[in-house]
Amino acid sequence: MPATPSFMKLKVDHKTVLCRDLNTYRALRDFLLNSGYSPVYETDRVGEERTATATFACLSSLTGERLAVVLGMSAPNEVSHAQAPFAYGFAGKPQKDAQTYMQHLALRTNDVEKLKSHLESKGAAFLTPIYKDKDSFGPLLQSFTRELFDDEWFFIEFVQRDYDADTVGAGGTQFVQNTVKSLYVSKQEEFREWEKTGKKRKFLDGVPAKDRTKLLQEIFANTEPKGYVQTVAPIARNVSLG
């Protein structure tokens, strides 16, 4: 068996959870701040003129885990994509009691350009180009896939931090405002297309059907810490990693 390329040796960078309403958003933010997490990014509004999100991101200095909490803000005549799980349901059914939804998992690589090219060569589809910017600690490169599953709103982010992200700790900004806004606009355009057509262009549509599960397993099996991916509900519902 050939050795795993270094760019495929992935590590969880952060995960992003969507909130149904302002009360849920505030409660989750308050809980995290009272559980040893420190803020690393916050904005009250970023997006388009009519729809947007509020975002709070934090870091646990004890575990190194980063979490982003997002509230979608819809307009009277337009739903924010960040409200899609609550407006349209997920896991194949309406979800009137759901207060949160795990929107995406960010996986860190040492070379996002090689990783993106590798996956695209197999037929995988990305929603965005590679955004190149800097946070408080150094260069930050990010690219986002199209959604993975028909009955979910879940996607993957691949991120490259050109500094030791495991040792910087709290303090400073570890997300980039321009990238957050660019992602919002791209996701909202993708969501409008889905509302119009009822069809999703998914991450693995261009991969031969027989190879799709294998490619996901290749990504997730090479992700540290082992077992973390299985705790992400949309993945656990759709992919067998055993």
Residue ranges and their predicted role:
Residues 1-41, 50-242:
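Glyoxalase I/VOC metalloenzyme domain signal
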Residues 44-45:
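Catalytic cores of carbohydrate-active enzymes
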